[in-house]
Structure formats: structure tokens, C-alpha cells
Amino acid sequence: MRRPLQAALAVVALLLVTACSGGSTDESEEDWTFTDDMGTKISLEAVPERIVAYKGVAAALADMGLGDRVVGVFGEPANPDPDLGLQSPDLDVDALPDVTGGEYGAVELEELAALEPDLIVTTTYGAGDYWYLSPDVAKRLGGTYDLAAINLEKETVDGVIENSERLALALGADEADFEAGHAALAKAGDVVRDAARAAGDPTIIATSTTPELLYVANPPAYADLTYLSDEIGLDVVRPAAKDLDEGDYWDSVSWEKADAYDADVALWDTRGGDKNLKALEQQPVWNKVRAAQDGAYLPWRFEIAPSAQGYATMLELFAGDLEGLKD
């Protein structure tokens, strides 16, 4: 398939710049350098002013005072239920040009080239992968543009925030712009803590589904679940290490054995709307567990901006969900 004209021109321009500067080894001439969480060193002639970002990262950049740098986004389609999707009070993500392709990991190259990005930013869960960019697409983009990744792999909430803020500071953010988010996060943590005590400190299981399997999340693999366990003090069900699938994110269980785990409250994966909740409700063996018998289901919001404000917003919503258990 032919590369769209704009992308081809961008490649030519990049090669010309490289050729013109190839004889210089003096890094002091470079005006902006940054080494991302994958260890990739990025060197540009100036601080990036035009950024295309994964939607969650775009929201986080806005939370940290850099929303005016974001000229386009890519990532998951909008959640069918906006209340369950990415919450971005500082940026209208849906109003930005969306260069997401027609399938997972794809990008509309011609539309991307038209945005003339200085930098493309997404997240990573390790193994050298750029989130929501297939390996082939990431390789192709890397030949034309500079890519940066924020690590989420087995990080705590504080770790994720630190990774995001490190990039934001390198981009010229004012650290004072982080203060409101940190204050909101501390306050939201207190609200969740109070809500958890009022709800009787329920045991929690975090789940996702496919037609064939129940997936039980491993808390250390998820920053939000680690926070609920370590900072709030909730008992979050943790599969045994020997039962974890490759990557240590889940224990996959056949529906015939879906009552192998028990908990007071079940969190359901909100990606794609309420389809995972409906799947749980329709499984007879699963319906033997306490959470199912009591109808104690709460949304597990997967789409979180990796910023202090992003996690604060998630926790505020979770506190409200916990309080709703008493209704």
C-alpha cells in the first residue's frame, strides 16, 4: 500500500534534516532532549509544540497545564456510556482531530501527517510496546516522527503520576500547575477511605470477561487496585501467583469454575460500556458468589488520565459508587 503523500513528504523532510545535521556530534546544539520510560532518547531542535497523544495522555497533559500543545489524539472509541469513559475536565478530547484507524493499533497516516506533530506520546505496559499502536504501526511512525511513552507497567499511582510529570516538566510545564491535582488526589483518597469504612470495608474482586472466561485481576499489576489495597486498606482479592496468566495481569477462569473466588463487591471492566456487567449477570455459577447474590456491582473505570487529577477524578467517582451500595 502506498504511503499517503503527506506522510511521505514528512519522511523526506526528516531525512533532509538528518542529512544536514549528520556531520555534527555536538549535542549542545540540540535545544530539547528527553529520555522516555522505554529508554528512548529523543532529540529535537526545539521544545515540542504540537503533540498527538493517546487520549488518556492528552487528558493528563491538559491536567498539567499543557492542553494547548495537544493537536490530535488516538485511542479507544468513545465509551457508549460517557459516565464510564475517560473523564477529562481540562480538555474536550472528543473535539480534537482523531487519527485512530479502523482497527486496534492503526493510525490514519494521512490525517496524522496533516497535523504536523513534533511528538507522539502514548503509554506503555513494558515489553517495548507502545499502547494502542501495533508494532508495525509504531515502527512505521518511528521512521517519521519521534515517539515517547509513559510507563504504566506495574506502577503505583504515585509512580504513574511521577512518570507523567517528568515528561510534562521536560515539555515546559510549571510545577505549580500540578498542585491542584495533588490536593484533589489527597482529598479524594480521604473521601474513599471514609466511604470504605462506612460500607464496612468490603472485600473486592476486579473482573473482566469474554464469552468463554472470567478474568480476575491481579492487584499489583494495576495502579488503581494497588491504591485501594495499600492506601485505602481494602481487601482486594489477589490470585495466587501460580494461577496467573502470562504477564501476571489476570487469572483466567472458565465460567464453570467462576465461583472459585468470592468477595463482597465485584468491580466490572467498563471498557465497551456495560457489556462486562451484563456478562457477569448472565452466568449461573458466578451468581453463587456473595457480590452477585447481593447485586453488589461497581464499575471498574479503566480509562484514567495518568495524572494526579485523573486519579483524583476516578477516586471521587469510586467513592460515590461505594456510597451507593447502602441505597
Q: What is the predicted function of each stretch?
A:
Residues 46, 106-116, 252-262:
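Short helices/loops that flank or line small-molecule/ion binding pockets
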Residues 2-6, 10-11, 16-63, 174-208, ...:
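Bacterial Sec-exported substrate-binding components of ABC uptake systems
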Residues 57-60, 76-79, 126-129, 153-157, ...:
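Solvent-exposed loop/turn segments at secondary-structure junctions
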Residues 143, 257-327:
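Structured C-terminal subdomain patch of bacterial secreted/periplasmic proteins
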Residues 217-250:
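Alpha-helical, coiled-coil/dimerization segments enriched in small aliphatic residues
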Residues 50, 54-111, 115, 119, ...:
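A short, structured surface patch at a secondary-structure boundary
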Residues 138-211, 304, 308-327:
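Extracytoplasmic substrate-binding proteins
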Residues 36-39, 99-108, 245-254:
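Short helix-initiation/N-cap motifs at beta->coil->alpha
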